[in-house]
């Protein structure tokens, strides 16, 4: 039983595969007899713990490469320099939209050339992208959307005025 448990632990990476490991026989396991004698002052030694796995000279160690992340927040002083306009033909063009938006570039997405199903999938993808990166998405026309990063403020018609006007005409 202990052998199977040990093999499982080695397989899962919870224990090192030690070639010199000798399992105890599963028969009687004896414990050392406990002594009732008082402990005598013994010399206390402080030793450094041995590492669980000592590297051998033949073992290969790969160099560590740092991960470079794209800047998620831009300085306010840098200003807005470009906007990407995308006319996707299929859902495969979502990569271009995602990469531009991730880099902090506002994206105008025109899905008029797409079928209903793919256009809906792409809008759903864009909504998730905007939510994950704390941006905003706005409908410009029926099938044109503006994806704005968190540091870009879109100034346009006053939404409260248009909501009041809509509620005025909706007197049902």
Curated annotation (Swiss-Prot):
GO terms for cellular component: cytoplasm. GO terms for biological process: division septum assembly; FtsZ-dependent cytokinesis. Residues 16-78 are annotated as: Disordered. Keywords: Cell cycle, Cell division, Cytoplasm, Septation. InterPro entries: Cell_div_SepF (IPR023052), Cell_div_SepF/SepF-rel (IPR007561), SepF-like_sf (IPR038594). It is found in: Cytoplasm. Residues 17-48 have a biased composition (Basic and acidic residues). Pfam families: SepF. The keyword Ribosomal protein does not apply. Cell division protein that is part of the divisome complex and is recruited early to the Z-ring. Probably stimulates Z-ring formation, perhaps through the cross-linking of FtsZ protofilaments. Its function overlaps with FtsA. Homodimer. Interacts with FtsZ. Belongs to the SepF family. HAMAP family: SepF. PANTHER family: CELL DIVISION PROTEIN SEPF. This is Cell division protein SepF.
């Amino acid at each position: 039983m202990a052998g199977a448990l040990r093999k499982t632990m080695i397989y899962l990476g919870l224990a090192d595969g030690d070639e010199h490991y000798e399992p105890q026989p599963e028969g009687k396991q004896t414990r050392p007899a406990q002594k009732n004698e008082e402990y005598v002052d013994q010399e206390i030694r402080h030793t450094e713990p041995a590492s669980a796995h000592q590297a051998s000279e033949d073992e290969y160690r790969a160099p560590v490469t740092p991960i470079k992340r794209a800047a998620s927040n831009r300085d306010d002083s840098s200003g807005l320099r470009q906007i990407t306009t995308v006319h996707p033909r299929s859902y495969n063009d979502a990569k271009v939209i995602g990469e531009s938006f991730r880099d902090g570039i506002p994206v105008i997405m025109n899905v008029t050339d797409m079928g209903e199903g793919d256009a809906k999938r792409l809008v759903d993808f864009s909504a998730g992208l905007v939510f994950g990166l704390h941006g905003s998405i706005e409908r410009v026309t029926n099938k044109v959307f503006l994806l704005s990063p968190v540091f870009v403020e879109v100034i346009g018609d006053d939404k409260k005025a248009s909501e009041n006007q809509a509620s005025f005409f909706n007197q049902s």
